[in-house]
Structures are given as C-alpha cells and as structure tokens.
C-alpha cells in the first residue's frame, strides 16, 4: 500500500540528491566525477543519477548546487496521438474546419509552443492512417507508426525513436490545447524534476500532461492490460509509482466546459467558433 505520513517524513529526513561536486561552466559535459550526493534540505524530487552522465550543463553552476532536470539539457517533444478508426466520429482527424483538417489545427497550435524541440504525430500501421502520415509530411513535422491498441507503447516507441527525455501528451481531438499553458507546464516540470506534470484549472480537452520517458516505460512494464492504455491519465495519476506535479492556469474556468472533438455536434460547435474568430 501507500507509505503513511510518518514513513514519508522519515524518508525525507535522510534523503540525498545528486549535486554538482564543484563549480562548472555552461555546456560542460557531465561525468561520474562531477556528481556528489548530499542531503536535500529542500525535500524536493531528486533527478535519477543514471540519466545525468553525458548531459550538458545548461548554465554555469555552483559547487554543491542540487541537480534538477532544468540544470541539464533535455529534449522535449510533443507527441500527438491520432488515428482514423474513431467509432464515435469516424475520420474525425480528417474532418475539416474552415478548410483545415482538425489534426492540422492541433499541429498549428503546438507549433506556437516555445519550449518544444520536436513535434511527432504518432499513428498506427493501418492503411487508413496513411492519410495522417501525408498530413504530417505536408505540415513539416515528424511521424511514427506503432501499435493500434497499445497506446502507451506507441507513445514510448515514438519518444524513444526521436530520443526524447520528456514529452507532452497530446490527443488528436484536442483542437484548443493551450500553447502558453504547455510552455508553463514544461518549465514547472523540469524545475520540479517530477515524473509527470498535470495542468489544472483548465476546461476539459485543453489540459495536457508532461511525461518523462521513464514514466511511460514503467506503465508499459506494469500495466495489467496494455491494450487498455488509451486513457493514459488514470495510470499517470498513480502516486504510488510516480512523483506528480500540478500547474494551475491561474484562471477560473467553468469545469463543465468540454472542448474536445468527439461527436458530430462538436464539429459543428468548432466550425462556428473558428468562423466567428476568423472573421
């Protein structure tokens, strides 16, 4: 079961985290001799030391400064998962709104992010999804083709194929995902050195998660039914396995709002919305 409060407090008292053994200059490549373990009085989440060797230091650092994810270079990607086999709204990724496929509108928004190094469209090997690959090529982004049912595996393989350390989990129906909140969440995610970061105070369909590669690997290795990982959020919220970080939008949205493309009436709603704001 979960650790009780006493055990958590006890572990925090004696927790050690990796730190820089001496002053280091920006762009220094870390070796094992650059790292020391010291007591973490901040009680923060330590970076896994196994992931530090060979990494470049982002900025000049001081002796015994604790190492956080934002202390070293990280490759951050946005992985958009989509396929054409939707049952509720068939081919919804290809349905057009104001002359653009809905999946292209998602790509447009992610391209506005400043903290993302790479955008990847992760789809399946099914012939029907050839059209999605064509759109990815047209829009100048990368693509990966993987498992149809095991969505967690598709994320993991896509991230690994492009050497990502962390990725933003994007679903193809998230037409109004917020690029400013994504950037804000990435900064918080790296600063906290956590496993997964959730956005809060956001309408349904606009909040996304930032996930480390090791986190998605753990889900693949422990999920009792790998083909039931489409709703990945339920696995990511397991605080028994993962250190979880939350980032609020700072706004008071109506939590009953649903901004996602699932049904025919959603398509009509977004068409009206885009027509209004594109006048």
Residue ranges, per PLM feature:
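Basic phosphate/pyrophosphate-binding loop/patch that engages nucleotide-derived ligands
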Residues: 161, 184-195, 212-228, 235-238
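Short, well-formed alpha-helical segments that are part of the catalytic scaffolds
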Residues: 89-112
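Short aromatic/hydrophobic "clamp" motif used to bind/position activated sugar donors
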Residues: 167-168
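Conserved alpha/beta core of the MobA/IspD/sugar-nucleotide pyrophosphorylase nucleotidyltransferase superfamily
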Residues: 73-74, 211, 232-279
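Conserved donor-nucleotide/metal-binding helix-loop-beta segment in metal-dependent transferases, i.e.
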Residues: 157, 162, 174, 178-203
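Catalytic cores and adjacent flexible loops of soluble metabolic enzymes
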Residues: 1-73
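N-terminal nucleotide-binding beta1-loop-alpha1 segment
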Residues: 73-90
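Conserved N-terminal catalytic core of the sugar/cofactor nucleotidyltransferase
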Residues: 104-163
């Amino acid at each position: 079961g979960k650790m009780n409060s006493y055990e958590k407090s006890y572990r925090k008292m004696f927790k050690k985290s990796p730190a820089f053994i001496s002053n280091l200059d920006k762009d220094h490549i870390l070796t094992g001799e650059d790292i020391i373990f010291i007591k973490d009085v901040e009680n923060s989440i330590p970076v896994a030391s196994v992931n530090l060797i060979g990494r470049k230091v982002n900025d000049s650092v001081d002796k015994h400064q604790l190492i956080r994810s934002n202390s070293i270079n990280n490759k951050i990607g946005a992985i958009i998962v989509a396929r054409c086999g939707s049952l509720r709204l068939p081919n919804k990724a290809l349905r057009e709104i104001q002359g653009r496929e809905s999946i292209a509108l998602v790509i447009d928004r992610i391209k506005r992010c400043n903290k993302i190094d790479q955008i990847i469209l992760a789809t399946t090997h099914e012939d029907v999804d050839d059209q999605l690959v064509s759109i990815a090529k047209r829009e100048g982004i990368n693509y990966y083709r993987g498992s149809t049912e095991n969505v967690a595996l598709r994320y993991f393989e896509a991230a690994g194929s492009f050497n990502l350390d962390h990725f933003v989990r994007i679903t193809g129906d998230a037409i109004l995902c917020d690029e400013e909140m994504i950037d804000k969440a990435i900064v918080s995610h790296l600063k906290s050195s956590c496993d997964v970061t959730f956005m809060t105070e956001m309408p349904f369909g606009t909040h996304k998660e930032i996930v480390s590669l090791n986190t998605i690997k753990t889900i693949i290795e422990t999920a009792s039914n790998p083909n039931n990982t489409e709703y990945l959020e339920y696995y990511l919220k397991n605080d028994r396995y993962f250190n979880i970080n939350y980032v609020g939008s700072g706004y008071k949205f109506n939590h009953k709002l649903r901004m996602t493309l699932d049904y025919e009436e959603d398509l009509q709603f977004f068409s009206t919305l885009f027509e209004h704001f594109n006048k």
